[in-house]
From Swiss-Prot:
The gene is gmk. NCBIfam families: guanyl_kin (TIGR03263). Keywords: ATP-binding, Cytoplasm, Kinase, Nucleotide-binding, Transferase. This is Guanylate kinase. It catalyses: GMP + ATP = GDP + ADP.
Length: 195
């Protein structure tokens, strides 16, 4: 079955943004507002953070399990960064789309662009920009969960990700949460098939 045949039954919405931009919050609020989206849960080898649940926030896999799935072509996309693997499980995605679900993904820039390359116009790429690099640095420091070196790496990665914003279908600066959610929800509602 081709990607086009599967996707005639559901749509893909992909959120990307530098870490600390608020994409998880925006995604959650947009999902609550629209009610017609199902969150695609990514797999990862990173350690579970406080409050996270396996199968809800991520599918937490051992490195060995993840590498086995890579060898079996079990991912739509996967990435290795900051010492951990992240990926989108092919079987879970296909099952949800076949069931007619519209899936929302939280992916890095490379993963988003890979997904768009595979699924074309059936995928809508949404990029959230921070108000400024200074504000992004402040938000990341407020998390107090990373070393100075990791923070520096995240900020460098953010600059790279921001350079790809023009490759996305819809770009919005997250400087006001309410306005951002309104704009993103409106664009997604226009993209989804009408009943």
């Amino acid at each position: 079955m081709s990607a086009e045949q599967v996707l005639d039954q559901g749509r893909l919405i992909v959120f990307s943004a530098p870490s600390g931009t608020g994409k998880s919050t925006v995604a959650k609020l947009v999902m609550e507002r629209l009610g017609s989206l199902e969150f695609s849960v990514s797999a990862t080898t990173r350690q579970m953070r406080a409050g996270e649940r396996d199968g809800v926030d991520y599918h937490f896999l051992s490195r060995e399990e993840f590498e086995k799935k890579i060898a079996e072509n079990g991912f739509i996309e996967h990435e290795f960064f900051f010492g951990n693997f992240y990926g989108t499980l092919l079987d879970k995605t296909i099952d949800a789309i076949k069931a007619g679900h519209n899936l929302l993904f939280d992916l890095d820039v490379k993963g988003a662009l890979n997904l768009k390359r595979i699924f074309g116009d059936q995928a809508l790429l949404v990029f959230l920009k921070p108000p400024s690099m200074e504000e992004l640095a402040r938000r990341l420091q407020a998390r107090d969960s990373e070393s100075a070196e990791a923070l520096k790496s995240r900020l460098e990665r953010a600059e790279m990700e921001l350079s790809h914003a023009g490759e996305f279908d819809f770009v919005v600066v997250n400087d006001d949460l309410g306005r951002t959610v309104d704009a993103v929800a409106t664009r997604i509602a226009e993209f989804l098939p009408q009943p």
